[in-house]
Amino acid sequence: MEQNIIELKHITKTYEDGFSAVSDFNLEVKKGEFITFLGPSGCGKTTTLRMIAGFDIPTEGEILLNGKPITELPPNERPINTVFQRYALFPHMNIYENIAFGLRQKKTPENVIVKKVRKVLELVDLEGFEKRRVDTLSGGQQQRVAIARAVVNEPQILLLDEPLGALDLKMRKEMQLELKEMHRELGITFIYVTHDQEEALTMSDKIVVMAEGKMQQIGTPEDIYNEPINAFVADFIGDSNIFNGIMTGKLKARFCGGEFVCVDDVEEGTHITAVVRPEDVILTEPAQGQIRGIVSSVIFKGMHYEITVESGKNEIVAQSVYSAKVGDRVGVHVDPDNIHIMIAEDHTNIFPAEINKNNELEYNGNVLDVALTTVIKGSRQTEDGAILDANGSEIDTGKLRIKISIKPQDIELTDVQEEGLVQGYISNLIYKGDHYSYVIHTDLEQDFVVDDEYLWNMEDQVGLLMPVEKMIFTVKK
């Protein structure tokens, strides 16, 4: 059995203001693996890396290195080195001295330093650069020096926090391949952080997809791309057509206005999310398609055309080596094994309400237009405002807990924030064929999911209009 070099057990990082950057995170990394933390900004990937390095201490949980706890161990006592996006090279030292710095701190003999520095210079293809100044190097060369300085100490684990972020596109692509080759030659464990899906797919043995401080999925690049576990992963990894639908029979699903044969055996009547990659969409003559539509957009991407087809309220994006004309009527065909079916997630929003001294329901300082006697079945209110149960006994409303639930499609967004029951900003959005699914991070530090047919922008400040008649109230004592 392969040995776990690093284990994270129920790791949580919560800051003084109550913000949870990482929540109940569990991970096992095998010796010699190249593993990548992938996710959008603010998902907790860098915080997790910093806890492995020892720069941050988890609020809860345990970190093990080769089976031994290192949660409280300071960074300098861990056999772990880190390469950051900003390489932090010493400008007053030449390349040789930059690389040798860590070895000198350890009081390594000079003859050993010479051998090790020469070896890593050869590894990063910088032989002959020993006496060069840092400011004479290109961005890619500086990045190699930073990696050489890290690996010369022979760490068991190398952490890389978006090290290619400062490079141009061509240099990034070259360095992706070079890093993968370095990993193969060194044989040490690489843990890499990026928001760039192409980097993750190109270099990794395993990818950990993160969102909002939680692991969404872990798997090989092929697993993550071909078998996303939820709509977030499908949307974040590569381009995807994502549709809500329902299973209509054995290996049959209806979505996007048509019925499709699929290979995922999900029970009939189950609400599903269907994922189809643009490269798997085949455009045909209208009569030959499973659904039909009109071409609304054609964009040349170099290696292919990106063609958008409107079918009713749905949009389907296809990639094709053949062009089309805007306004063309086309058929859309997808082979069964190119349809990925996931059981639909229940995104019902649940939040607490308070009962004020007047026995009125409040949320976020707003009185809700609903009588408490409507919420508490069988109750009635006296003239002095007391709430009595069906037996005539007074209810101590201070001991009641009221939960409100409301469906994403029943909430409306408004740019007049003060009109909303609660306010916040759009932190995530996914297009689902005939509508957008938004995550709103509110001022109360709660996330709401809202379905809306209109396109809003990331970071837009919005108010949430929530009709009382669409709310379901649950009473707990």
List the model feature ranges, each with a label.
Residues 194-258, 304, 335-358:
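Internal alpha/beta loop-helix hairpins
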Residues 61-69:
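Conserved ABC transporter NBD signature motif
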Residues 38-40:
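The feature captures the beta-strand-to-loop junction immediately N-terminal to the Walker
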Residues 73-85, 89-232:
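ABC ATPase nucleotide-binding domains
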Residues 18-20:
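Short coil-to-beta microelement around the adenine-binding A-loop and adjacent beta1/P-loop entry
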Residues 53:
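Helix-to-loop junction immediately C-terminal to a conserved catalytic motif
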Residues 254-297, 321-428, 454-477:
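Glycine/charge-rich catalytic "coupling/switch" loops of P-loop NTPases
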